[in-house]
Structure formats: structure tokens, C-alpha cells
Regions:
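Conserved active-site and cofactor/substrate-binding residues in soluble primary-metabolism enzymes
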Residues: 1-9, 51, 78, 82, ...
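Midchain, well-structured core segments that form catalytic/ion-binding scaffolds
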Residues: 1-77
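A short linear hydrophobic-aromatic micro-motif
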Residues: 55-57, 97, 129-135
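Active-site proximal loops enriched in glycine and acidic residues that flank catalytic Cys/His/Asp
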Residues: 58, 70-74, 100-102, 135, ...
Length: 198
């Protein structure tokens, strides 16, 4: 739950659905504190790329006009069209119009791709350990690379996840290790070294 959704929840407790308006009523009922899209009928798990996530990006109310933006990140096992149709169906009960402001397909690159193998070998060359590969729903720069790149690091085994938190940070030694891994990966890319060569 983010600040905007928490504010709507507070308003919904203090006022009736008629008083807060259709959009706030919809947000309170269909989103509330959820991030998995369950109440919207969107909850989806994908063993390859993880769960669908939803959050309220912003809400703007001025006079009789109200707008809200939702950030929905869906797994590779479903389509943006199916997400849009279900969201529109859920919003129709509150007589709300829905339009897509921006759409980016989820990014997924197979673990056995040459790029992933090369990056994994760079990680192993520096750390001496096999990397733990995983996907996230993050809206990273890698999406802009058209499937020819991916986000790479700097999370290590047993790290506490504090991404986007107030105390987001990285240990200095791990930062330098990550820099070494990136340099090794760039060197391997430049020299055309495959994952089998050391």
C-alpha cells in the first residue's frame, strides 16, 4: 500500500461511498491495501516471471473531475490485453472509464540465453560462486533495450531487500564487488569471451 492508497482508505472510513465519489470508492474496494490485484480479478502467478503487481500511481480530484493512474506489472504468462479487459470490467461496476496511458510488455530473457550465460560466468569468475538468477517486475532501464539487455545486480545471496525503502543502501564492499563483476562482464562482451572460457 502506498501513500495515495492509504489516503483513499482513510477517506473511505470517514465518509460514505457517495461522499468520496466513484473513483475513491473503486480504489478502496478494488485495491485497498492489496498489491496482487486479487479484488480486481487480476491475481496471477507465473513460475517464470513472478506475480502480477498493482499499485495506485496517483489520484487527482478537482471539482467534479477525478483521475487515477494504476501501475500494473504483469507476468509473461498473460497479455496486456487480458489485463486491460479485466481492469475495465472491474471499473465498469463503478461507472468509470478506463484508458491505457502507457504500456510496456514485461521483459523476460531465458536463463539459457547467451547474454545470461555470459553475465553468470562473469559473476562466477569474480565471486567463485554460482549466481542465483531471478526476475522482478521492476520497470528498469533494461526494458528500453528491446530484449537485448537486462538489469544486472547488485543483489547478493542473503542480502536484506531494502530496494525503494527510506534506508535503501548497499554495503561498500559489495558495491566494489558488483563493480568488479560489471567490469568482468563488459570485458567478456568486448572480447567475445563465452561462458565456457575463463
Amino acid at each position: 500500500c502506498n501513500a495515495a492508497a492509504a489516503l483513499v482508505e482513510l477517506l473511505a472510513k470517514a465518509y460514505t461511498s457517495t461522499e468520496i465519489g466513484a473513483i475513491c470508492d473503486f480504489i478502496d474496494i478494488a485495491l485497498g491495501n492489496e498489491t496482487d490485484g486479487c479484488s480486481l480479478g487480476l491475481k496471477t502467478h507465473c513460475s517464470i516471471s513472478g506475480d502480477l503487481t498493482v499499485n495506485l500511481g496517483y489520484i487527482h480530484i478537482e471539482g467534479n473531475e477525478a483521475r487515477a493512474a494504476f501501475d500494473i506489472r504483469y507476468p509473461v504468462s498473460i497479455t496486456g490485453g487480458s489485463v486491460y479487459r479485466q481492469f475495465r470490467y472491474a471499473a465498469k461496476h463503478n461507472k468509470l472509464d478506463v484508458k491505457v496511458l502507457n504500456h510496456e510488455k514485461p521483459l523476460y530473457i531465458q536463463k539459457d540465453s547467451e547474454l545470461v550465460k555470459l553475465l553468470s560466468s562473469a559473476y562466477k569468475a569474480v565471486t567463485g560462486e554460482e549466481p542465483e538468477l531471478y526476475t522482478t517486475g521492476g520497470g528498469t532501464y533494461a526494458r528500453k533495450l528491446g530484449g537485448k539487455g537486462l538489469a544486472f545486480g547488485p543483489a547478493f545471496k542473503d542480502d536484506e531487500v531494502n530496494m525503494h525503502n527510506a534506508d535503501e543502501s548497499i554495503d561498500k564492499e559489495k558495491f566494489f564487488t558488483h563493480a568488479q563483476i560489471c567490469l568482468e562482464a563488459m570485458y567478456r562482451m568486448y572480447c567475445g569471451i563465452s561462458d565456457n572460457e575463463n
